[in-house]
Amino acid sequence: MSETAARIQTPYLVAEDELDRSLRPRRLVEFVGQEGLREQLAVAIEACTARGDALDHLLLAGPPGLGKTSLAQIVAAELEVPFVQTAGPALERKGDVAAFLTALEPRSVFFVDEIHRLPRALEETFYPAMEDHRLPITVGQGAGARVVTLELPPFTLVGATTRTGLLTTPLRDRFGIQARLEPYAPEELAVIVRRSAQILEIGLEDDGARAIAARSRGTPRVANRLLKRVRDYAEVRMAGIVTAAAAQAALTMLEVDERGLDRLDREILHAICSK
């Protein structure tokens, strides 16, 4: 069964997706950590809103699970503009890019996840769109071919990447705002765990939040995943409250060690060190 079919037919997976979406912050004030980036975005958003302009194109880099997609959605929410999302691998032909760009409303946020996986041949399609809000399209073939230039509304391209080095310099330089998200401190992750527990209506003690945060490898996505697994353990084996003891017991059962590494992580590290 394909992943798409499984998601259509399995209510549990759909419910899990809905839960994950409900944990995403919706406004900058709700976003924990990355203080410098939050301030930079707040200033840029307020300035472009006052001018009535589209926000400069934004490149968000960093490891998976740090909040790049959430920030892109937050930018659109703060600007009160439409949010359109796709991914680099999904754009295979110039027609795919043209279909998205020509459908954008003024000042829309167009989010391209994994932008480093965008085919090189398509990068040049973005250059005039990003700089001049124009999209040259070749109509016809052979000697009768001609170029028609489509006018585009001002928009903001938000690119997310885990591998900045794979972006070409011409594409990277066209992003007016470039930022890198860094791993979160344990205290920040504890705040995120407490917020998620409140949304999910999980009984949580502060020491339980800190215990989960300490093993989350600096990543909110990991913290939220561990919180849900510890919740399950606390409901079945404990009194239903996520305490430090419940977190310790649950994470031991899951074979997650003090550094946040599970058994597969340790096996991979062992294999690397054994070479």
Residue spans of the language-model regions?
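C-terminal helical "lid" of AAA+/P-loop NTPase domains
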Residues: 209-215, 221-236, 267-270
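Pre-Walker A (pre-P-loop) alpha-helix and adjacent loop at the N terminus of AAA/AAA+ ATPase modules
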Residues: 15-63, 98, 207, 212
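Conserved AAA+ ATPase core "coupling" helix
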Residues: 166-214, 224-225
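Short amphipathic alpha-helical elements of helix-turn-helix/winged-helix folds
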Residues: 44, 233, 271-275
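Conserved AAA+/SF3 P-loop NTPase catalytic/coupling segment centered on the Walker-B
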Residues: 75, 94, 108-138, 164-174
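AAA+/SF3 P-loop NTPase mechanochemical coupling elements
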Residues: 140-160
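Walker A/P-loop
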Residues: 46-88, 98-106, 127, 162
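C-terminal engagement/docking regions of AAA+ P-loop ATPases
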Residues: 2, 7-13, 22, 245-275
